[in-house]
Amino acid sequence: MAALQYNCDAGLAKAPTFHPSLWGDFFLTYQPPTAPQHVYMKERAELLKEEVREIVKGTNELPKLLDLIITLQRLGLDNHYEIEIDEHLHFIYNSSCDVKDLNLVSLRFYLLRKNGYDVSSDVFLNFKDKDGNFASDDIRSLLSLYNAAYLRTHGEEVLDEAIIFTRRHLEAALTSLESKLADEVSLSLQTPLFRRVRILETRNYIPIYEMEPSRNEAMLEFAKLNFNLLQILYCEELKTVTAWWKQLNIETDLSFIRDRIVEMHFWMAGACSEPKYSLSRVILTKMTAFITILDDIIDTHSTTEEGKLLAKAIDRCSQDANEVLPDYMKHFYMFLLKTFDSCEDELGPNKRYRVFYLKELLKILVRGYSQEIEWRDEHYVPETIDKHLEISRVTVGAFQLACSSFVGMGDIITKEVLDWLLTYPELLKCFTTFVRLSNDITSTKREQTGGHHASTVQCYMMEHSTTMHDACEKIKGLIEDSWKDMMQLYLTPTEQSKVVAQTVVDFARTGDYMYKKTDAFTFSHTIKDMIALLYVEPILF
């Protein structure tokens, strides 16, 4: 079968110049609050947690219940009340709802689908007039409908139409709204509520909630303390992984890679934000570091032969393989093996077996990289975007990170779950397709100036003889299809714990955030302010 041709230099990628770290050793000098301060914060938070629990238990009216649970989720407090919220969700699912109240119906639909209940979207047909338009001009109701509609699956035309209708009306009304509602509408038009990274939403929402006349003071204080305690934990983790990163001697041995250890932790914290996932975040950050280094070596720096040698060494995971590597790779490779050993110690005797999966994930990654090296050197473009994705959805690294997140989790993740994840189930295929397409839209122009293999964008352009603009527009549609695919699988009952699907969706949210406007990981100045809010600036009382 004849290969399509794409012009790039064979044998050696042209290394780009990445901007240096924006944070340097900043977090190495992090000083946590004094022990008495920390103890006070935790004790006060425990008291407030129980006070809020009484509020959660005592709320029974449907409108108040919907508002309460959504507020708890946005404040980052819902994980403290999982049992109570599950009971309330069961009640909400089995309760009748005023089918004439668009806001109420939308909030109920949003909350139930967000928590895995496969409720029908036909309920929204009740709000369409004889012309097929939604019969409402209330902005709050339209905003709720807009956010609810993004939990759509394939074939739900009423939700597709709802997004078009509400977006048009919300955009038209934006300039005439009072500032608080205008800000909320503007934010939703940029990123619908369901797709926001949860911990970043919490950091942004707490100051907004503080301005609400109807706010609950106990919930507000608990939310602030809860976030600030989490921020302390994040900074301690970041101090640990920064010290680990320094041992790689990036400045001398790997000066050409993206020096982004802070951004790596930031990304992983977005996917696994809760305190109980501390070990998972640390392991994930280290895996992200290895994936970044491998990507930058093989994709943009090494010769073809050097890249293949490194891929073979990763596949062996043996100290002997280090002997044939170029000098600049040797320390990195041995450090990789040393980190695998330390991960076994961190996981403990009952979970050390899980490091096998980290190794297997990197082996899968470099096999894909080897295929892409051949594409680059042979000037090859796969004939269809589907054939491209067979390889490129694996090499984007999202599969490796999503699976790695479960290695550091508790007993709820069994060996059977990890084995199942390695089979590359459909949910992970949909997720990694989404990340690959999102990545390619933002990075293709930059990468094609550096002798990179053809991306899915170039593949689509050549397959359909179209322009880059048209290809990107089409791929945006495929990205929306990937969200629908993920949502359908998210709502489909499986033998796996619901934490698996929830975590994959959380990773999708981080991918949407990092690739929404640019490649924010590579050009990390675009997220520096948000990183400061998450790590450096506590929420004031």
Swiss-Prot record:
- Record GO biological process: defense response; diterpenoid biosynthetic process
**Gene3D superfamilies per the UniProt record, alphabetical:** Farnesyl Diphosphate Synthase (1.10.600.10), Terpene synthase, N-terminal domain (1.50.10.130)
Q: Which reaction does it catalyse?
A: (2E,6E)-farnesyl diphosphate = alpha-zingiberene + diphosphate
* Residues at which Mg(2+) 2 binds: D295, D299
Which signals induce this protein? Up-regulated by herbivory.
This protein's pathway reads:
Secondary metabolite biosynthesis; terpenoid biosynthesis
Which SUPFAM superfamilies does the entry link to? Terpenoid cyclases/Protein prenyltransferases, Terpenoid synthases
- Stated name of the protein: Zingiberene synthase
